[in-house]
Amino acid sequence: MESTLELTKIKEVLQKNLKILIILPLLFLIISAIVTFFVLSPKYQANTQILVNQTKGDNPQFMAQEVQSNIQLVNTYKEIVKSPRILDEVSKDLNDKYSPSKLSSMLTITNQENTQLINIQVKSGHKQDSEKIANSFAKVTSKQIPKIMSVDNVSILSKADGTAVKVAPKTVVNLIGAFFLGLVVALIYIFFKVIFDKRIKDEEDVEKELGLPVLGSIQKFN
């Protein structure tokens, strides 16, 4: 019975503050939409892959050893891709449109465990630029690693052409997140409003706050 009364009380409080529950989430939603569509710059990510591949041979045991050796070299090659030498060469390949430090901030290098694949990911504000930069990294890396390591076991597996996708801002996530944030703020506001509002508004408040029985009430006349 007591829990039912509490739920009824909560329902009444929410109904009395319905405007706040509607206005604040909508306000947060509108602000998020403005920031997402008009303030934040879009980011596009393009991907390309290079393969650390074994030389051709007829000896299965030798080939298996070379595959394992190439897998171990992948981590070294990942660091080479991010090295100043590669960054400088890519910057030159792009006619110095981007500085090496800027290229470094756009670049992410990953690989799947126990594979000979290196994934080159590039993020920029333009779809075509992301693809062009990713392709340049793949091209320069495949040319420079043989010179640096004195081995010829790197090739471009896939180019970035047509791979660029928009990765930021995440419109749906931003809008939904802003709406629920506004809802939480509204509920917190209502909670503190109820906690700190000590005004006596009805007979129940008189009995609860003053501990006095209500003998009668005077109707309000207009």
From Swiss-Prot:
GO terms for biological process: polysaccharide biosynthetic process; polysaccharide transport. It is found in: Cell membrane. GO terms for cellular component: plasma membrane. Keywords: Capsule biogenesis/degradation, Cell membrane, Exopolysaccharide synthesis, Membrane, Transmembrane, Transmembrane helix, Virulence. The chain crosses the membrane at residues 20-40, 172-192. It is a multi-pass membrane protein. GO terms for molecular function: carbohydrate:proton symporter activity; protein tyrosine kinase activity. Its main location: membrane. It holds the Pfam family Wzz. Required for the biosynthesis of type 5 capsular polysaccharide (Cap5/CP5). Might act as the chain-length regulator. Belongs to the CpsC/CapA family. This is Capsular polysaccharide type 5 biosynthesis protein cap5A. It comes from Staphylococcus aureus (strain Newman). The gene is cap5A.
